[in-house]
Amino acid sequence: MIRILATGDETSAPAPEGRHSDGHDYVIMHLINREHCAGGVSRVYRKGAGRPEAETTLTEPMQTIVIDDRLMEHEVTPISPSGGPRAVRDMMIVDFDRE
């Protein structure tokens, strides 16, 4: 589980920060909870490509992104509070290998 919090005027970056691959065959990213968030845009790239293949904002619990981590990289933009005192973004990440 990864929880990102932001309060006041701060912006909080996801962990790990930046565009990356997890080093497994597949990655499954489930949104568990999202409260008062601006940002948190998920982007998926082919390895080495400049533009994202997909870009979406997960807004509802259990919305999911599944990628082939051998071929793709992913990133999430920082979050900040919107419409409340604290932004919360909870994700469950499942990495697995076929063997």
Residue ranges and their predicted role:
Residues V41-E99:
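Catalytic core of Fe(II)/2-oxoglutarate
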Residues I2-E60:
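Catalytic core of non-heme Fe(II) oxygenases with the double-stranded beta-helix
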